[in-house]
Amino acid sequence: MPNVLITGANRGLGLEFARQYSADGWDVIATARQSSPELDALGVSVEGLDMRDLDAVASFGSRVGEGLDLLIANAGTYGPRSVANAEDAQGWSETFTVNTIAPFLLAHAVRPAAEQARGKLIGISTKMGSIEDNTSGGYIAYRSSKAALNAAWRSLAIDVRRSGIVAAVLHPGWVQTRMGGSSAPLEPEQSVAGMRRVIDGLGPDQSGGFFAYDGTEIPW
């Protein structure tokens, strides 16, 4: 049975990824700082992991075992809405830790297992991380951390290409989650189902790409 490691799986998109993959018979390793009743009800393997704890993230590969078919680095934070003072700047730094550095460290930590399975490494990004698409400004911490994630994942895809691993970043759309709000047009089920179709279709030619949940390629 194929296996998937999902971060930030206690709610929102991460929970929906865990629900859908579990329903399809995958062996799911779900991580979160704290679990939730909804996640516990799925009956999947739940591991505590705080993405702010970089030592724990970097050593997580030993908890995966041999062979990893899919990593979905989903956990993230919005960070401060503006950066106008030293306190905001500290929040910006923490946003980079969670949204950029920790996902990359985790991908590196599980790379040996992914190589064994010729697996896929997926970073959940956002269209707000596209420099070309930024026509409205604002949200400095979130935008910049996701733009950096995109750049890191692009390099990761190049670095792992010879080992048979496929790596890409995905934009889930504007989704009804705690981050997206209730006015968002997409439900988590729709977004995740779309992203799963994109993931299924990824091959070496698409590695290093940036795609929306509907398969549309997004400019960097």
Predicted regions and their residues:
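N-terminal Rossmann NAD(P)H-binding glycine-rich loop of SDR-like oxidoreductase domains
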Residues: N10-Q20
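Conserved glycine-rich Rossmann-like NAD(P)H-binding loop of the short-chain dehydrogenase/reductase
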Residues: Y21-L39
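Rossmann-fold cofactor-recognition segment
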Residues: L42-D55
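Conserved Rossmann-fold cofactor-binding substructure of NAD(P)-dependent oxidoreductases
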Residues: R52-G67
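Conserved mid-core alpha-helix of short-chain dehydrogenase/reductase
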Residues: A56-S59, A102-A109
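C-terminal helical subdomain
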Residues: V169-P172, G181-W220
